[in-house]
Amino acid sequence: MTATLLSNELSTLISDSKRKNPDLRNAAERSLQDLRSLPATSEQQIAADLSRHPAFVDPFLIACEAKNAKFAASGINCLQRLVICKGLPKLKLKDALDAFNASAALGLDVQLKVLQALPSLLQNYADDLKDDLLAGALQVCASLQSAKVQTISGVAAATLQQLVTAVFEKVGDEDRRAAQIPATHDVPGDGEPIMLRSAAFDAYRVFRDLALAAEERPTKFVQLSSLSPESSLELVFSCVASNGKLFVSHPELLSTIRSNLLPLATRALSEKHGFPMTVRCLRILNLILTRYFKRFPGECEVALGLLTHSLDSDTSTPWKRAMSTEVTRNFFATGALVIEAYAEFDQADGGKPVVQDLLATFVRLSSEKPAIIGLGQQSSIPIGPTPSGDGSDPATMEAAGGVAGVISSALGVAEASVSGISSQWSLPKTSCLDQLDKAEGPTIPDTYIYTMVLDCLNSLSDSLARVVLPLTVHEDRSDAVPSESHQADDQSQSSRKSRVQRSQSFRMRAVPANPLAIDENNVAPRLRAVAGIIDSCWPAFLATASTFLNAALEEQYYRNLIKGFQRFTQVAGLLRLNTPRDALLTTLSKSAVPPHVLSAASGGGTKSPSTDSPRSFSNHRNLLSVDSLVSQATSLSSDRDRRSSIEPAHPMLTTRNLLCLRALLNLAIALGPTLGAAFTVVVDTLRQADLILSNGSAQQLVRQNLSSKGHDTASAVQAFSAEVAAVENAVSRLLESTADYPSEAFVTVLEAFTRLLGAKPLGMPSLPTPTQASPPSTPTTSHRNFSGLPGISTFAEMQARDYKFVIPKLGNLAEMNIPRFVSNDAKESGWAQLVDELLQVAVSSSRPREARRAAGDVLCKAAAGVVLEVVEESDNVKGAIQRSGLGILLQIVDGIYSEDEELTATDLEIQALVLEALKAILERCGDSLVAGWDKTLAVIGSAFERTADAPTFRQGDTDTFVEWQYVTEDFVSLPIGRAAFSALQLVCSDFLSML
């Protein structure tokens, strides 16, 4: 095949050049004679024979140099065939490349043949293609890439890319055989000359010339004058992106980046270039920032400063600003670069606040066009830049009407005429940095830049958390190590089984370690940088996040914002940075219960919650008590068509508010033992949410909204109910986790709850927040405010609300911390405080009936709990606990009868609870009672009337004295007598010998 083709082409050249080019004819005749003289063997043999005859290719070279398209077509065709079959003599490689260059300006067929020959030349003559030969091959591709025919230009660009890639692959192969190849070439470095081997020297010269061509400066190795700066930058980007490890190990390449590439890429931020040049420069800058930040800290500082200016500048074109933000987003998303940048610049002595300035720019950027992001009083659903004409669409109805309540809770409250941020219209189909085919800057969605700011906030939180969270776990913890509140390791297995069972995930909970206490050399600097970022940048983070917390965001954007906010707050708390932690918690609290929603709910609901609210004090698990609210919503959907008019809807909590509440609770779970007085933020927020969800006016709102919208009622109620259930579960886990708190932290939690029983404010330091993060002011009312709840007009009503919220929580805390109470001092463990606070409520006739019953019930269960907890303990341990537990029952009874007022039905109900608790203790562990029998008899004796001059019971440290001569034979009431008789019957029948 090869011999035939060559013979035919030579014959054609002889025929066509008889009169026009005698030299070509003579050379062709000689080559044809040489070809015919070769033995007719295999193709491989013919190629090998031809490779030993350098003169054979002369007619083809002459044909290419003749500037005749017809001659050149034959010459190039033959040279291509010889290259493919390795029949081209190596001595003629340079001549062949010169011939290719000479023919590059001829016809389309000739150019295609040249481009087809070059890959084979690279493959079959790779070892020989170096120095000037390499430069010649690259020059051919570069000149053809500037061809006007798109086909030729595209193929030439791909071929040039292939050749450049091969150059760097040869460097990798050479590095693997470095010991066998001497370094013979020296090039200038940053400090001193660098010695290079052959392949590395070629790669250096090619890369340097590409960088020079991008700056439109004269090249030194390859003639690239015909190569456009944009094409040069694409090749440079490909080299750097595809050979990361190679560049790191070759300082001469890094030196070229520093001296040529970085200045060019950085100037694109401050100079005005067209889109094609700018996008390629910023792609390179993005690559260098994310991959070689540590190699060029000084240059990166300048670049980041210009990026900040580009983000903050109104003079930048929208597409340039968007590209700058994309580079910033990628910088934040790559590893821990932002932490390294802070340590390198902001934290250094005399360093510039690079990271701080960048985050401060986010604050200004996020608030520059509030209408575009749909900024309002709270977060809402984005409705899109163009409204829909179909009013029957559920999403459109919710958005246009701004309806609040359970329906909109499932979707989020939307305000009319907002655009907002959504993946449907805020994101371009292709990022700006990837639009290399555009000659003009693309149209950028107005809200695109805000999506990237949200991404930056999320990435920042992730980076901080990845550094800090792994260091907060105590490495020496194991299942055998109890928390501070459990110190009974020597107890038997049966004793441990009798204790209150808690989920295993919280059994090993302990105070998170403070990572800043770690003194390891490789960890401490990064931790100090993280702490510095939070300490100096939290106002900017908070202000930016606060803006978006009240913007119209798509669901996923909002959830990611909350997750990032939660992580940032958690890191601040774990590092014991209390000021930023408290400010962030407060902002999250206000997003969970917006002031305008709280004001509307508390101001509009003046009915007594004791009659309107369906909640039960004894319902410890249904912590937000909204089951009846949801069931009302479901049942009311059936009569929506019968209502002739709808009252104006008022603000209501949404699923997004509940999501914020859940995030706040999760933070309390993660940081609980370290929160201190800040725990009151969590308690107050939970109480406010409970107030709104259980308020009579809120339930009327549900009735209003469901009456007007029925076709999506079930799904909306289900979504709202699911979020409420998630919040309730988080509350349960929070209360459960207190079992592993140190006693001091647990007492703080108790104080956060018990202060509400007497409307006693617990001191909290003022929490600094930036002005940008301040929520709308709460409308004032003419009523006096109690417990921070506006609109509650009477002290009694405030107390009733707080009792219904607090007492069930105290019951949960008591249940979860029974082991703590029996193992520690009563005052240190919080037992004394819990009993005193609940006792004041239970025995006071001025307190609401339901509150008294609930407090008495909690006390009775706690008293029984501590007695049951020590059944398997030694007599010494049991005696003290049994006296304490039974003494509480006696204190309740004594407190009821110590007041100089007539007994009420509530007093008798509480006394009945006490007698039932006593009976339960006797039934379950009466045979293990070693102390407290005097208190038992005193409680039973309280069922009888006493004379007018009878003193109260006298309880000593160990004994209780009952002066029976003052006890009559008449029962206080018949039910009380029956309850006392049951307990006494147990004593007489089973435990008489123990008295």
Stretches with model-predicted labels:
Residues 2-9, 38, 46-61, 82-109, ...:
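Amphipathic alpha-helical segments within extended alpha-helical solenoids and repeat-rich scaffolds
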